[in-house]
């Protein structure tokens, strides 16, 4: 029995040995060159990189010479077909050439004239496996290498060319099936005695291969992030240990997803593309961030779900995964699933003090102009009335001079004096005299007119009447009506403080009012703060200054936790995140209690995949169809509507229960603050305060008048006493 078993295994072992060594047939150099030329032309590319190493397997000088001969012939035929080629004899230069093409997003085809097991590890270590790079291995073997010996793992694209007989070549491809085992499959062949290549193009396209995954199972990291994923964690699923990133440890930590927009999207994709998925818990329950600047080029430079993708332990990653330059170096993104914008949420603007409502109908910059207008209206009115009296005065030579009780007639003096007297002209008043205390009357008249008090006509002149009409129109239609309408509006709907809806206002609030800004840990919003410029950099510096003792003090586990923090009374707190995520979480606690800022910057969310993912094109096609048909927007709106219905049902239930106890009054009061409320005595506090201030000012002025009158009487008595003493001294 053992003899027959050994004889059965002998052909298999001989096949393995035969597949790993070079086998050349004499005088077949032109056949090999022709076949390789046809194979390369079947790829329909215009350039080719060739790696021809002085392999140790070619110890025989004849074999080495024969390979050089067919290589030269192959290059000549390739150049005749207008192909560009570059030949490398050193692996380092060859790898650098591949890296430069990948950095420029250029498709690169390489022909390696050596066995794959010598270069496979280097290709994986240097992350050269990509859907844009194709490696063609030909070393003259009759059979392809066994999957037990060599495994070509995704995303590495490999073509193995074998030569089972003379003028016959077989082409094996590792991505001919959508499964993840990457086994070599026969996809084409070349027959020199027939028509050459069996089919053109040489390889099946990735769109056709990965249009149907045929039940392939993908691992998807997930964590609780409404409205994208609603996750329920199992017992002790979040335990930090050193081996958390191992695949066995990750699969042991089970989670249960109960809903979410991206959960629905993933179910739709799995149904359309025929694959299955398995949720695993993302390390740290975060999207992931860069560990340090020193290890950014390593294979595990990111944490969280992005770190699982980078290390190849996961296939997809959804859940508002924002695009950024730092993340793009570690993973790739599909067509965007959400066009969003950055924003921050704070508490709703608080109601202002109702006692000062009488000052709010006009803005602060209007009150100075209004007060100056009222102050200068009196002097202007006085000038309009007094100018005619001033104009009617005339200069004339008076014949009679008054010197106390004496009357001097200038005509008589001219007659009795030999010399001529120089007479000075004097002002002669008109018959109509200026009213007594006209200036004070004008001041009080304008004040009573602007304050809508009853007042008599001050002057009969047409100029004064015209100005009185102008003042009355300004006081009635401009000031009184506008002020009354605004004040009525303020009483009907009490005013609130200015909202904090811009970065400038948020920065001022953090500096002057002690506001604290929170952000989800290891999120794209945190990367925007860390790597941003101008205001974002200043805000990040303020955040770090406010929590000097606790460097992680401004981190929150999720946006939902930040909104809950504000809802519980955090009136001096703000949360930065995606606007859609903020809006959804705000709906849970009542949109009237929060204030969303303006759109700060544009951000896109997409499905994250591994670098060089071979099925990214197929995934993009499906996502673009969903986006163009509006299905993505409908899914988002449906998730919002579902959550809104749940919130309304919860609110109605709580209202019916709390209406029977003492807390119903506080609920009603908080609700009444958002709608039009009737006038109450609290709103009229400002009028009584103004009355009290006016009464106090009047009392102070009266007291000052009494004091100054007494001082004037004392000074007059002292002056009279001095005059009496002076007269007495003169008489003596």
Curated annotation (Swiss-Prot):
Keywords: Behavior, Cell membrane, Glycoprotein, Ion channel, Ion transport, Ligand-gated ion channel, Membrane, Receptor, Sensory transduction, Signal, Transmembrane, Transmembrane helix, Transport. The chain crosses the membrane at residues 370-390, 466-486, 689-709. One of its GO terms (biological process) is detection of chemical stimulus involved in sensory perception. One of its GO terms (molecular function) is ligand-gated monoatomic ion channel activity. Disruption phenotype: Response of sacculus neurons to changes in humidity is abolished and consequently larvae fail to move towards their preferred humidity. It comes from the Eukaryota. In the antenna, detected in sacculus neurons which innervate the first and second chambers (at protein level). The keyword Hydrolase does not apply. It is a multi-pass membrane protein. Belongs to the glutamate-gated ion channel (TC 1.A.10.1) family. This is Ionotropic receptor 40a. It comes from Drosophila melanogaster.
